Amino acid sequence: MAKKSMIAKNNRPAKFAVQEYTRCQRCGRPHSVYRKFKLCRICLRELAHAGQIPGMRKASW
């Protein structure tokens, strides 16, 4: 889990555009965040398995 201070820092607008970085909207994790969903890989996997992301299904080939 991210510290509350880092989540609050991420929620306010950055002074310059280059200072913005992606952070998971659900848990606040800063690494491996998918831009399309704004979720980290762990939260994305949990929501996909629960069927809460429409159109996403487990790959099999």
UniProtKB/Swiss-Prot annotation:
<dbReference type="InterPro" id="IPR043140">
    <property type="entry name" value="Ribosomal_uS14_sf"/>
</dbReference>
<dbReference type="InterPro" id="IPR023053">
    <property type="entry name" value="Ribosomal_uS14_bact"/>
</dbReference>
<keyword id="KW-0689">Ribosomal protein</keyword>
<dbReference type="Pfam" id="PF00253">
    <property type="entry name" value="Ribosomal_S14"/>
</dbReference>
<feature type="binding site">
    <location>
        <position position="24"/>
    </location>
    <ligand>
        <name>Zn(2+)</name>
    </ligand>
</feature>
<comment type="similarity">
    <text>Belongs to the universal ribosomal protein uS14 family. Zinc-binding uS14 subfamily.</text>
</comment>
<keyword id="KW-0687">Ribonucleoprotein</keyword>
<keyword id="KW-0694">RNA-binding</keyword>
<keyword id="KW-0479">Metal-binding</keyword>
<feature type="binding site">
    <location>
        <position position="40"/>
    </location>
    <ligand>
        <name>Zn(2+)</name>
    </ligand>
</feature>
<dbReference type="GO" id="GO:0019843">
    <property type="term" value="F:rRNA binding"/>
</dbReference>
<dbReference type="GO" id="GO:0006412">
    <property type="term" value="P:translation"/>
</dbReference>
<keyword id="KW-0699">rRNA-binding</keyword>
<dbReference type="InterPro" id="IPR001209">
    <property type="entry name" value="Ribosomal_uS14"/>
</dbReference>
<dbReference type="GO" id="GO:0003735">
    <property type="term" value="F:structural constituent of ribosome"/>
</dbReference>
<dbReference type="GO" id="GO:0015935">
    <property type="term" value="C:small ribosomal subunit"/>
</dbReference>
<comment type="function">
    <text>Binds 16S rRNA, required for the assembly of 30S particles and may also be responsible for determining the conformation of the 16S rRNA at the A site.</text>
</comment>
<protein>
    <recommendedName>
        <fullName>Small ribosomal subunit protein uS14B</fullName>
    </recommendedName>
</protein>
<dbReference type="InterPro" id="IPR018271">
    <property type="entry name" value="Ribosomal_uS14_CS"/>
</dbReference>
<comment type="subunit">
    <text>Part of the 30S ribosomal subunit. Contacts proteins S3 and S10.</text>
</comment>
<feature type="binding site">
    <location>
        <position position="43"/>
    </location>
    <ligand>
        <name>Zn(2+)</name>
    </ligand>
</feature>
<dbReference type="GO" id="GO:0008270">
    <property type="term" value="F:zinc ion binding"/>
</dbReference>
<keyword id="KW-0862">Zinc</keyword>
<feature type="binding site">
    <location>
        <position position="27"/>
    </location>
    <ligand>
        <name>Zn(2+)</name>
    </ligand>
</feature>
